[in-house]
Amino acid sequence: MVTLKKKITLRRKVEQAAFTFSGKLKVKLLWKSKTDLDLCLFYTKKNGEAGGVFSNEYRQKRSDLGSLEKFPYILHMGDKKEPSKNNEEVEQINIASLDEIDTAYICLINYDAAIEGEDVTYAKEGGRVELESDSEDYLEVLADSEEEGHVYWVCSIKNKGGEYALINKSKVLDIETAFNEIPGFSLICND
């Protein structure tokens, strides 16, 4: 059992924290409301190719969940959730390796609101993204912006040659802007 270091919260946009891991990294979305939020991880490979790992409910493809045994070495846990403390909702992505990834983009999507065209913010969801590494790093970025939009680009992970930086992005976007600004996001918009 890994004993985590004290949690570090990145509160300001572009604030960053270094971390390492050697085979097990958990990225969790936790939130208090009953809103159906989706955790997604999009990425740019070192060769410039874009991809993503997200719920298979978007395109009805099991492969969208990813894999820990082969590239991308990232797996969205789907409905297999770890129990949470405090009765919070949880979605989780596990990462075995980021060796081939240059940058990972961690986003939340309020899919139902996007489909219905509702104006929404993330301020009342009580959300945050937590990152826990097997090197005992424990980082969090709050997802509580009052800006309107269906996509919340919470943070990014930058690969710095085996050391990593978690960067607070705190950027709320509409679907079209996310499509244009987040590499790999277009995957959930297409079959």
Give, region by region, the residue ranges found by the protein language model.
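Intrinsic-disorder/low-complexity signal
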Residues: 1-191
